[in-house]
């Protein structure tokens, strides 16, 4: 599934990332607010859905090779976090949907979870 498709399914706003980056393919998704779980279970090239908007999310994404983060529940990171994501080439999205609904919509549309991936 492309980032653009994810954006459309979640009716999300692009916080950082250009049109070319939105064509990137994402293999699977994960909804999580506990960054230690992200490091334990998530695979590379995964979409992370989270309600956390601090710098730690960006650093965790970098370590886990996550290319896209979508903030749920209308959360918006501050400028410092957005700038850090741009430096690390991490695409940021934002949706008004809660995490459960976001995960459900994406799963229904065919995006698998990390437990189902390779």
Segments the model singles out, each with a brief description of its role:
Residues 2-5, 98:
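Short, structural beta-strand-to-alpha-helix junction motif
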Residues 21-24, 30-47, 51-118:
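Feature captures the catalytic cores and cofactor-binding loops of soluble hydro-lyases/lyases
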């Amino acid at each position: 599934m492309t980032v653009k498709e994810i954006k459309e399914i979640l009716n999300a706003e692009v916080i950082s990332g250009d049109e070319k980056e939105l064509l990137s393919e994402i293999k699977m998704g994960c909804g999580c607010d506990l960054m230690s779980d992200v490091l334990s279970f998530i695979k590379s090239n995964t979409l992370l859905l989270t309600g956390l908007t601090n710098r730690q999310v960006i650093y965790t994404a970098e370590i886990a090779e996550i290319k896209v983060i979508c903030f749920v529940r209308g959360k918006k990171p501050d400028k410092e976090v957005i700038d850090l994501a741009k430096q690390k080439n991490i695409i940021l999205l934002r949706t008004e949907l809660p995490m459960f609904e976001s995960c459900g919509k994406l799963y229904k549309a065919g995006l698998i979870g990390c437990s189902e991936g390779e």
